[in-house]
């Protein structure tokens, strides 16, 4: 029977399909649409899903369990460049704003900040945990997602990372997802995760864990050479590790904190204590 839809739970599952050794044997000519959701999907993976899986009308959705779950989504007629690089626009009857995490004020268009959403889909609260509810939902009923996002002049939202994952190196704010998106463009890189690790000189340094494509040979010098002249010098990972897999939850979400903890152990690093 012909299938026309593909529903995926984020980039992990779609990458497994795209890189399956028998992928070329399957006829996907009847596929046309689907939904990508569950975890951030790199631009390069979205492009491959469109071109290699024939999903010309695929959409992407963003949200969280606490928002029932979708707050933003693209549509089948959203321009392709917006569908692969953003999570679309706010859903009908909901509100979204991007705020400065410190002041709580809305940031200008094109500037990053914390994504907040409000509307009928937002939960009433965490069962039996009023303190946690107050941390997440403010007095005006805005749900603070903890995600860093940018909204353009047309209302398209781009998720640039998690607030807790942002790396501050020598006073420079670095979003790991930006580095991941860049490294995905390397033809030998199958998957990559970037985290911050403690550093005595700069406070934090970047660390990249990389899974190479099957049969490919990669080393640190090749990765650094690929980065030079293409991204700012302080965004080039100081530590590069090649691995076969990332630590994940049972639902397929990558556990960056475990990568960070393992690197701290390997390198004998600890965060500097502050007053």
Name each model feature, range by range:
Residues 1-13:
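Single conserved hydrophobic/aromatic residue that forms the stacking wall/gate
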């Amino acid at each position: 029977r012909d299938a026309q839809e593909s529903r995926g739970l984020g980039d992990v599952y779609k990458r497994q399909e795209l890189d399956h050794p028998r992928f070329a044997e399957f006829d996907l000519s009847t596929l046309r649409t689907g939904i990508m959701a569950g975890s951030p999907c790199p631009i390069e993976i979205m492009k491959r899903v469109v071109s290699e899986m024939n999903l010309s009308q695929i959409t992407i959705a963003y949200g969280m369990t606490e928002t029932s779950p979708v707050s933003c989504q693209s549509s089948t007629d959203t321009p392709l460049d917006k569908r692969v690089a953003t999570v679309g626009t706010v859903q009908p009857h909901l509100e979204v704003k991007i705020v400065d995490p410190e002041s709580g004020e809305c940031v200008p268009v094109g500037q990053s900040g914390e994504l907040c959403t409000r509307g009928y889909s937002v939960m009433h609260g965490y069962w039996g945990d009023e303190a946690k509810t107050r941390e997440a939902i403010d007095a005006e009923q805005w749900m603070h997602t903890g995600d860093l996002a940018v909204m353009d002049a047309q209302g398209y939202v781009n998720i640039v990372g998690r607030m807790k994952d942002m790396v501050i190196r020598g006073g420079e704010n670095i979003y790991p997802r930006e580095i991941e998106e860049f490294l995905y463009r390397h033809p030998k890189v199958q998957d990559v995760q970037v985290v911050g690790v403690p550093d005595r000189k700069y406070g934090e340094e970047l660390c990249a864990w990389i899974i190479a494509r099957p049969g490919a040979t990669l080393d640190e010098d090749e990765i650094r050479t690929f980065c030079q002249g293409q991204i700012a010098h302080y965004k080039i990972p100081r530590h590069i590790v090649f691995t076969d897999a990332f630590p994940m939850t049972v639902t397929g979400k990558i556990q960056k904190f475990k990568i960070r903890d393992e690197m701290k152990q390997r390198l004998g690093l600890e965060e500097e204590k502050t007053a």
